[in-house]
Amino acid sequence: MKIKMFFLTTAFITQSTYASELPVIPLRDLVNAALTHQPSVAVSYYETEKKNSDLDLSRAALYPTLDLTSGLNNNRKESSGTERNVENKVSLSYRITDFGVRGANIRKSEYERDNSKTDYEKTKNIVSQEVVTTYYNISKYREMIDGVNLEKEFYKKMLETFSLLVSSGVAMQSDMRKVQVSIDALNTRSIMYQSMLDDEMYKMQNMTGLNLSPVQIQSDEKFNLFKKYIFVESPEKLMDMVMKYNDDYKILVNTRKAATEDINAAKSSYFPTVDLVSSYVQNNPSGSAKKSDYEDEFKTGINVSFNIFNGFRNSAQERKMVASYSQAKLQIDDFLIKTRYNIDSQLSRYAAAKETYSVAERSHTNALQLTELYEQEFQLGQKSLLDLISSRNEAFQAYVSMIDSKYSLYILKLQQLSLIFHLMDYLKGNTESELNVMK
């Protein structure tokens, strides 16, 4: 039995030493790991590569095309036998003008390329926000568990004291039961918070690809960057910042501009196209073929192509593009309406959360002071054990409310920051002053 206890003690000490030696990973490193690990970020990146290629394809229409073709022709004639000729042809074609179709397509591709870059940054921002939210939840549940453990230590000491008092006949058995009930209630809370903490840790590990321990997550006391963030409480100023920095708004504006270029291209299709065409043909006759019948030739000319009728295809295409443009404008209006509502709602929730945190903090301080008084009065016999336990419960509930409201404030700051800026830039630590200057 002694050997077994020795090994258990050794294992516990080793585990504690190992836990204390685990490196604390800063939040910025966790975000970087998630950006590297999450496939959605890579998918968004390759979308930018596709749009860059689409832009190159659109620009390729500005250049001439040069083709080389070779062919062998056999021509059997009864009078002269078989004539053979190897024809080598070099063709040069260049579109002189199409009255704006190519330019409109290039500008559209540029807007789509810009949208893909913005969407890439948006994807990174979403992943960053998920990591930071999970980090906050981990930190919150760790604080909850720490609070539970402190309460359990108090009740365990009280249980030891009452065990001695009961055995000596000074206290009653029911007093011990009251203390044990409080410990059981705290154990239930501890299990619940631990389950929530484990769930958030699994989420963090899934997002980052790292095998983490809760002790490796940077504690809230050592991470105060979001505490320093000045919450924008002016809806007009916040709306201006959204229209300047928000990724969704940028994408919608570029989509509208791309639709404008589609309309321009559709209107330009009513005009003719003018092409410069040149070709050089080199003939190499053989067999019974005569050289005079297969002379080399060089041609050059200008082709003008004008569509007279194509079943109203051009007008249908123009109407389609006009509808797409109207749709893009309405999507911007819809975004602005929803954003204004979200801003008003966010500001209202922030004001309530700030007031709630202030009240909860004050309530926790008062509850602790009340508990201290009850402890003194309990020792003097002026308060019952039930009174003391009730005061401890009130203090603990105030602690839970204070922690909840504190992290509610953090989450609201995080949501606003994600709305107007890229979290990764903010986490670099060199943009905080810039953000506050913009306000």
Which ranges hold each PLM region?
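Amphipathic alpha-helical coiled-coil segments
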Residues: 43-58, 123, 127-148, 157, ...
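Small/polar (Gly/Ser/Thr/Ala-rich) solvent-exposed segments
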Residues: 42, 65-85, 93-122, 250, ...
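Amphipathic alpha-helical coiled-coil scaffold segments and their short linker/junction regions
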Residues: 28-38, 176, 210-279, 426-439
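Transmembrane beta-barrel architecture of outer-membrane proteins
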Residues: 85-87, 133, 178, 297-299
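Sec-dependent N-terminal signal peptides
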Residues: 4-13
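Acidic, low-complexity, intrinsically disordered peripheral segments
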Residues: 21, 28, 401-439
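Periplasmic alpha-helical coiled-coil/stalk elements that build and connect Gram-negative outer-membrane
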Residues: 5, 25, 126-241, 346-349, ...
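Sec/Tat signal peptide C-region and signal peptidase I cleavage site
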Residues: 15-21
